[in-house]
């Protein structure tokens, strides 16, 4: 009979972090929410694809809401109560992710839009003809 092999990997530490930063990156295809401590070390993260949404359903506001709720649930295990929110990107999940962060019981102290704006950088993709 085979012996059970114990994992010798790193165990997740329970940190006590009352204040953090929530980064919401909302693209046309997906929404990624990352919660970090004030220095920038990742506490919890989640995305629409991680919640089981595939293809075009990943870019919906509902998928972003589910991802934000999951991320807050993970972050609250580390004692998170107050966040600053940095929103990046043009996607449809921006507002709903922000609302669900607030509805999940986190205090939002700051909302900042950090979407990168090119000073005439790369050529944009061609217009869609549908």
UniProtKB/Swiss-Prot annotation:
UniProt keywords, alphabetically: Ribonucleoprotein, Ribosomal protein, RNA-binding, rRNA-binding
Family: Belongs to the universal ribosomal protein uS11 family.
Keyword Ribonucleoprotein: yes
InterPro entries linked: Ribosomal_uS11, Ribosomal_uS11_bac-type, Ribosomal_uS11_CS, Ribosomal_uS11_sf
Signal peptide location: none
Organism of this sequence: Syntrophus aciditrophicus (strain SB)
Name the UniProt record assigns to this protein: Small ribosomal subunit protein uS11
GO CC term, one of those recorded: ribosome
GO biological process: translation
């Amino acid at each position: 009979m085979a012996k059970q092999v114990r994992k010798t990997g790193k165990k997740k530490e329970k940190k006590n972090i009352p204040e953090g930063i929530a980064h919401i990156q909302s693209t046309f295809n997906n929404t990624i929410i990352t919660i970090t401590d004030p220095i920038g070390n990742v506490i919890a993260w989640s995305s629409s694809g991680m919640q089981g949404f595939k293809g075009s359903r990943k870019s919906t506001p509902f998928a972003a809401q589910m991802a934000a709720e999951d991320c807050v649930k993970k972050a609250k295990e580390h004692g998170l109560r107050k966040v600053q929110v940095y929103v990046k990107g043009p996607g449809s999940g921006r507002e709903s992710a922000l609302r669900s962060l607030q509805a999940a019981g986190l205090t939002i102290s700051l909302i900042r839009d950090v979407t990168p704006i090119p000073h005439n950088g790369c050529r944009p993709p061609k217009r869609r003809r549908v």
